[in-house]
Amino acid sequence: SDVYKRQLQDLVKIMAYYKMNTLQIHLNDNGFKQFFGHDWSKTYAAFRLESDTYPGLAAEDGYYTKREFIDLQKLAENLYVEIIPEIDAPAHTLAFTHYKPEIGSKEYGMDHLDLFNPETYKFMDGLFKEYLEGDEPVFRGKKVHIGTDEYSNKKKDVVEKFRAFTDHYIRFVEGFGKQAVVWGALSHAKGDTPVKSENVVMNAWYNGYADPATMIKDGYQLISIPDGLVYIVPKAGYYYDYLNEPYLYKEWTCLLYTSPS
């Protein structure tokens, strides 16, 4: 709705006032199926950006037109706030499998893309390309976030496919002159398939998914956002409803990649 769009514009202005300079916008996600009768087809999911490549993909209950998203980025640029758009895949992708069920994973759940299906790559290539191509792309900034958050690591073959997917989309966005940003996942997804690290930025959010010392050794640039300290998920029960401001002010620095024991 227009209210939420105005809120995002206001957020950019507030960030600039407080000298905050980076806003990552997570454009797709979904609920947990246990809250929707254990039925993936009824589980809430949304992708929030207009798409001409895939008409009808954008959520009916609210999305940004391409022009609105471009204008938001221009506002941010004028205020020296960097917007990093994120399309999260190959997990958190129920909005995409609602739209195209054949690319959903039968084994790991429909919120996971099927990494063994070539159609998955065709779909995601088409989606990223829409916002990256042309002289005035929809994704205007220097960085693009490709997701890679919380995919299953139950079997070695799927881990290798996940690593290949990650490497593919790092290089895909780089092909359009962008710097790739990823969620930390490569300790969770240890394997043999190489994943590009040079000039790649990683969200270090949970050490069990990406051990910071290992990731730095491997060549990644890290953004320190330890979930146990800086995540707010109201009423979830496993993260803060409000930040622990006294602790953060007195004790935390961005060099601390873990929560206090």
Write out the residue ranges for each language-model feature.
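Active-site-proximal beta-strand/loop segments in catalytic clefts of secreted hydrolases
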Residues: 86-88, 149, 183-186, 205-206, ...
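Acidic, contiguous N-terminal accessory segments
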Residues: 180-189, 196
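Substrate-binding cleft of carbohydrate-active enzyme catalytic domains
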Residues: 5-176
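Flexible, acidic glycine-rich loops studded with aromatic residues
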Residues: 14, 194-200, 207-259
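Structural recognition of the beta-strand scaffold that forms the well-ordered cores
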Residues: 24, 144-145, 180-182, 201-204, ...
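Conserved small/polar residues in nucleotide/adenosyl-binding loops
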Residues: 2-7, 257-261
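Short glycine/threonine-rich loop-to-helix capping motif typified by GTGT followed
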Residues: 152-165, 192-207
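Acidic/polar loop patches that form or flank catalytic/metal-binding clefts of enzymes
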Residues: 174-184, 212, 222-226
